[in-house]
Structure formats: structure tokens, C-alpha cells
């Protein structure tokens, strides 16, 4: 099982705190260690030491808990990746044209009030969960930590369970091509 986390860490922190019960003799943390092979999380900002990324800042204690106690591999897709790998609006709209009124297009228009290229914050995390490292460079191992102000820090460490995604101008087109191939296929036809 792979978990793609694209929001606050609240539910994942609660999962770690879940005791054994009538449904399983294992705690939540034990179940994660036994059943999950990867947590792919959109979280943090690694290049600006003062940036409080939204998903982390909304529930700092839960983010701290998840990244400190998660028992298996975590791959983080940081803010700067999603803001740099923009999905061009015309292609985004074309890829979702299989639906007469696609809810994603409608919600983007309602939010932005205009056509605009889309950040891929959450999409990069999901793409890694679905497709692995094919479009990305993955950092070496380390620890991904959240301080009390909600600032994220990655510290390289051979025994760390965290890594983060990297990409650059040369690889952004491949990332967008991957999104396009997934989004342009009507629901249920993958």
C-alpha cells in the first residue's frame, strides 16, 4: 500500500496514535509498518528557511508527529517543486476535455476567476506515489523535521527514512507529460 498525503497531517498523526482494538491486534503505527511501503507527502519548503508551507502550518503538531514517528519510507514533494512545474492552462483544459464540464476545470475557474497555469503541488506527490521516480530525481536519505514554527528542515542522514523530490527546467516537461497521459484518459479507463 502507498499513501499519498496532499493536505494536513492530522489524520496520519491520528493513525499513528490508534491503539489495537477489536478489528486488529496491531496499533496504527504497527499497521503502517506492516502494510504501507511508502508515504508520498506534499509538505514543506526546503529552499526558504522562513517559509511556512500551508499543509504543515495548518497543523504543526500533527506534521511534527508524522515526520518524527512514521515507521517507513517517506518521500516529500516540497512546495518549490509544485510551484515550479506549472501545468499550462491550455494543455490542462485539453487533457480534461473528455468531460463536458469537468469539476477540476470548473473549480479552478471559480477559484482563480480566469484561465491560468496550474501549480502542481499535490499532483507531484500523487504522481510519485503512482509512478515512482521516473520523472524525478530523489534526494539521498535523511530526516525531514518540522520545528515549532512550522518550518521544515531536511537533514541528510544515512539512516533517515525521508527523501525529497527534485526536478529542474529540463525535467518539468516530462512531469507535465506524465500528468497529461494520466489526466487525458477518461475516468475508469486506466
Per-range role (PLM):
Residues 1-190:
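N-terminal acidic, glycine/proline-rich low-complexity segments
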Amino acid at each position: 500500500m502507498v499513501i499519498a498525503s496532499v493536505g494536513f497531517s492530522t489524520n496520519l498523526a491520528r493513525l499513528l496514535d490508534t491503539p489495537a482494538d477489536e478489528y486488529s491486534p496491531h496499533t496504527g503505527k504497527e499497521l503502517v509498518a506492516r502494510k504501507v511501503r511508502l508515504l508520498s507527502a506534499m509538505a514543506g519548503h526546503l529552499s526558504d528557511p522562513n517559509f511556512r508551507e500551508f499543509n504543515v502550518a495548518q497543523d504543526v503538531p500533527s506534521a511534527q508527529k508524522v515526520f518524527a514517528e512514521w515507521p517507513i519510507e517517506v518521500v516529500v514533494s516540497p512546495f518549490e517543486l509544485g510551484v515550479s512545474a506549472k501545468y499550462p492552462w491550455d494543455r490542462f483544459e485539453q487533457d480534461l476535455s473528455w468531460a463536458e464540464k469537468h469539476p477540476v476545470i470548473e473549480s479552478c475557474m471559480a477559484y482563480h476567476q480566469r484561465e491560468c497555469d496550474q501549480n502542481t503541488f499535490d499532483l507531484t506527490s500523487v504522481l510519485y506515489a503512482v509512478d515512482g521516480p521516473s520523472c524525478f530525481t530523489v534526494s539521498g536519505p535523511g530526516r525531514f523535521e518540522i520545528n515549532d514554527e512550522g518550518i521544515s528542515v531536511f537533514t541528510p542522514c544515512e539512516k533517515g527514512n525521508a527523501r525529497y523530490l527534485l526536478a529542474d527546467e529540463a525535467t518539468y516537461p516530462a512531469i507535465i507529460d506524465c500528468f497529461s497521459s494520466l489526466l487525458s484518459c477518461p475516468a475508469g479507463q486506466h
